[in-house]
Swiss-Prot record:
One of its GO terms (cellular component) is cytoplasm. PANTHER family: HEAT SHOCK PROTEIN HSP-12.2-RELATED, RE23625P. SUPFAM superfamilies: HSP20-like chaperones. This is Small heat shock protein C1. One of its GO terms (molecular function) is unfolded protein binding. Belongs to the small heat shock protein (HSP20) family. It comes from Rickettsia conorii (strain ATCC VR-613 / Malish 7). Keywords: Stress response. It comes from the Bacteria. GO terms for biological process: protein refolding; response to heat.
């Protein structure tokens, strides 16, 4: 008996929803809206609000993300990064082994009348260097919010294969 009731209730709901034109039609007069339509609209509005919340969050992330470009030339590699709002004291470029570390950090605390405002903006990149990068002569510059890192290339001499004698 319980199984037949479980199947019967959803069947009734489907029949009501499919037969009621006011529910199926979004172009209805709000004064003549059925309670079920009002509930459906409330759910639609909540889902739309959730979608908009994530949409705005993603667009905020995209607008604040660091844009970069890696250019390969015959005698050098060039890394160009857009870092608006950063000055050179807030950016560090370091080499350790075959890794290039690029970090930026801005922390500001502004005291307003009755509240504290904090701004924290940072980025962190780790780039594996090719073996033909002359690590001793890497240079960087910052101009108008554009960080440019020059990675000079050196010629790598291929070692000739030598045969190892087996004892």
């Amino acid at each position: 008996m319980l199984k037949s009731v479980r199947l019967y209730i959803p069947s009734i709901a489907v029949m009501i929803l499919s037969s009621n034109i006011a529910i199926a039609n979004k172009n209805y007069d709000a004064g003549n809206a059925t309670p079920l339509r009002q509930v459906a609209d409330l759910i639609d509005n909540q889902i739309t609000n959730i979608d908009n919340l994530f949409k705005n969050r993603l667009s905020l992330y995209e607008s604040n993300s660091i844009k970069s470009n890696f250019i390969t030339k015959d005698k050098q590699y060039i890394i160009v990064m857009e870092v608006p709002g950063f000055d050179k004291s807030q950016i560090k470029v370091k080499v350790n082994g075959n890794k290039l570390f690029i970090t930026g950090n801005i922390e500001e605390k502004n005291k307003a009348d009755y509240s504290d405002n904090y701004m924290n903006k940072n980025f962190n990149y780790v780039i594996s260097l090719y073996e033909d990068v002359d690590q001793a002569n890497i240079s960087s510059s910052l101009k108008n919010g554009i960080l440019t890192i020059i990675l000079p290339r050196i010629e790598i001499k291929e070692q000739e294969a030598r045969e190892i004698v087996i004892d």
